[in-house]
């Protein structure tokens, strides 16, 4: 198996450190998840980005447990994240949801617990359907729940006080929501996770968040590639970034793969990345994106590919107004 040096880490505003390169658990299927997590740990990965909605936390936990049991890694050397799903935003459900996650992962705490989306939906009991996805218990109708974000955030702050989450963060938030949140919170978000790739660079949001000492993690670093298997028309109709001439030219110049260039475009600017791969060689390549530098001309050429093209758009699924 190919191995790579563990990713360097950056310090969060909570004082903890997060690796710049992690392993994403989105779309990691149940039949391979445990083995993939185990292999990733053996390859040098220490950050694992998960979520309640990914429906694989039990298997992820099995892979972690195996690696710890074999002495490959200690729990304190790992950085495990999860995300609060929309159904559990009510303050009485926040701890319940995290306890379910911790039970599935077989862990005492997570290193970072995000709010997955800045919108609350009608809750569904865990025993009825878990994870519920966008199901609200009323056929196919999506229903909003009247829960202010600040109430949800204060419930997350209590999780930190209880030692159930070392740090807390936000995902898919706009600058306006962040502006409002940091003026009413006691514990500041340590991180913002957003869709980020050359077709969607969101430069003003990135600048605003970094000015407030909030770490950014970019998901879907390869743009449409992450959404092709979902048969998403917007992704199918978009040129694949891994084959984009500018990206390929820069990759050839540096003797790297297009995937490594796309990841380095983010990490060189301080943005953490969470790619997923089933191939041991690509897993090692993805982790090895700190050992070369893109020039300013490279960075500018990649940035010029931006066309504000978002693929993860909940409005397309159920008219859910996250980004509209």
Swiss-Prot record:
Q: What does this protein do?
A: Reduces D-xylose into xylitol. Preferentially utilizes NADH as a cosubstrate.
Top-level EC class as recorded in UniProt = oxidoreductase
Any signal peptide, and if so, which residues?
A: none
Residues noted as binding NAD(+) in the record, renumbered to the chain = 220-286
Residues bound to substrate: 116
Quote the EC number.
1.1.1.307
Q: What family does this belong to?
A: Belongs to the aldo/keto reductase family.
Q: Does the keyword Oxidoreductase apply?
A: yes
Q: Where is this site: Lowers pKa of active site Tyr?
A: 83
Q: GO annotations under biological process? A: arabinose catabolic process; cellular response to osmotic stress; cellular response to oxidative stress; D-xylose catabolic process; galactose catabolic process
Catalytic positions are 54 (proton donor)
Q: Can you name one GO molecular function term for this protein? A: D-xylose reductase (NADPH) activity
Keyword annotations from UniProtKB, A to Z: Carbohydrate metabolism, NAD, Oxidoreductase, Xylose metabolism
Q: Which domain of life is it from?
A: Eukaryota
Pathway given in the UniProt record: Carbohydrate metabolism; D-xylose degradation
Catalytic activity entry: xylitol + NAD(+) = D-xylose + NADH + H(+); xylitol + NADP(+) = D-xylose + NADPH + H(+)
What is the name attached to this protein's record?
NADH-dependent D-xylose reductase
CDD domains per the record? Answer: AKR_AKR2B1-10
InterPro entries xrefs: AKR, AKR2B1, Aldo/ket_reductase_CS, NADP_OxRdtase_dom, NADP_OxRdtase_dom_sf
């Amino acid at each position: 198996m190919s191995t790579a040096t563990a990713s360097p880490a950056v310090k969060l505003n909570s004082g903890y450190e997060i690796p710049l390169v992690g392993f994403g658990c989105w779309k990691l299927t149940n039949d391979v998840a445990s083995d993939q997590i185990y292999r990733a740990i053996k390859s040098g990965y220490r950050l694992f980005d998960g979520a309640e909605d990914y429906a694989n936390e039990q298997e992820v936990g099995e892979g972690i447990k195996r690696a710890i049991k074999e002495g490959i890694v200690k729990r304190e050397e790992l950085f495990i994240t999860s995300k609060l799903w929309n159904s559990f935003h009510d303050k009485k459900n926040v701890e319940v949801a995290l306890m379910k996650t911790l039970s599935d992962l077989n862990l005492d705490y997570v290193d970072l617990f995000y709010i997955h989306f800045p919108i609350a939906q009608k809750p569904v009991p865990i025993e009825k359907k878990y994870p519920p996805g966008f199901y609200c218990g009323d056929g196919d109708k999506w229903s909003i729940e009247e829960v202010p974000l600040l109430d949800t955030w204060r419930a997350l702050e209590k999780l930190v006080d209880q030692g159930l989450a070392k740090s807390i963060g936000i995902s898919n938030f706009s600058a306006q929501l962040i502006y409002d949140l940091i003026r009413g919170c006691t514990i500041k978000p340590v991180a913002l996770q957003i869709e980020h790739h050359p077709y969607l660079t969101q430069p003003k949001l990135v600048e605003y968040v970094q000015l407030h000492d909030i770490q950014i993690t970019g998901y879907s670093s390869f743009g449409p590639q992450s959404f092709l298997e979902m048969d998403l028309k917007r992704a199918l109709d978009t040129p694949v970034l891994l084959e984009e001439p500018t990206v390929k030219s820069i990759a050839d110049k540096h003797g790297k793969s297009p995937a490594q260039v796309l990841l380095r475009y983010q990490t060189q600017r301080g943005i953490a990345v969470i790619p997923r791969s089933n191939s041991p060689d690509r897993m090692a390549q993805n982790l090895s994106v700190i050992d070369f530098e893109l020039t300013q001309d490279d960075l500018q050429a990649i940035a010029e590919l931006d066309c504000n093209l978002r693929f993860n758009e909940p409005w397309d699924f159920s008219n859910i107004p996250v980004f509209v």
